[in-house]
Regions:
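Transmembrane alpha-helix interface/packing and boundary motifs in multi-pass membrane proteins
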Residues: 88-97, 130
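Small-residue-enriched transmembrane helix starts and helix-helix packing motifs
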Residues: 76-92
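Interfacial loop-to-transmembrane junctions
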Residues: 167-190
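Single conserved hydrophobic/aromatic residue that forms the stacking wall/gate
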Residues: 1-8, 13, 192, 199-201
Length: 201
């Protein structure tokens, strides 16, 4: 019994290390796309057409993944670093308006053969380094004269609060998305698309 417990603990540690390595690999394309596409994404945000296209693509991706019954049996040990790169690319694309980061990364993970539980967890935890990286990127945009002690404290305090709030909702998010069909999330994207089209006209 003690031997099996030790083996289980060792496997858990290995899974955690592999997951961490996969997350680091996924951040490479995310960071590159985020930095190079930031200006284009800001221009796209002012467009009346691009956000609608983003909602449409998100809905189609979710629906196709759901109808195709995508997903496999891969956990951290079976997941490849190539798949992490592809999922990271999908997260980088989500810098554009209308593209759901959670939707794109979850679908990509399922299409790469990840099991549903690991796909959801990986998608959720991928957001944390991306958010932190975006925070420090925005901080770097301020000049020394613009960055006061008060403003710096506000940013740090906001990040801490967001971190606590994120930790509280992560568990519920994982539990909810593990069981719900992706087509329901697709319908939400189409609802946003209709609302966007209504505002345009």
């Amino acid at each position: 019994e003690m031997t099996s417990s030790l083996v289980g603990s060792e496997m858990c540690i290995r899974d955690s290390r592999k997951t961490g390595a996969l997350l680091v690999i996924s951040m490479i394309p995310t960071a590159l796309l985020g930095l190079t596409g930031k200006r284009l994404a800001l221009l796209a945000a002012d467009s009346q057409i691009v956000p609608g296209i983003g909602f449409l693509l998100t809905g189609v991706f979710l629906l196709v993944t759901d109808l195709n019954k995508s997903g496999g049996k891969k956990g951290p040990r079976e997941a490849s670093y190539d798949s992490a790169m592809w999922i990271g690319i999908c997260q980088g694309i989500a810098v554009f308006p209308g593209i759901s980061r959670m939707g794109f990364t979850l679908c990509a993970a399922l299409l790469c053969g990840y099991n549903r539980k690991f796909a959801v967890r990986f998608s959720v935890f991928m957001s944390l380094p991306a958010i932190i990286g975006a925070f420090f990127t925005e901080i770097g945009n301020f000049g020394a004269s613009e960055m006061t002690a008060g403003l710096g404290f506000t940013y740090v305090f906001a990040m801490i609060i967001a971190g606590f709030a994120g930790c509280l909702v992560i568990r519920n998010t994982i539990a909810m998305t593990q069981n719900i069909k992706l087509r329901y999330f697709a319908s939400v994207s189409y609802t946003h698309l209709r609302a966007h089209e209504t505002r345009r006209h």
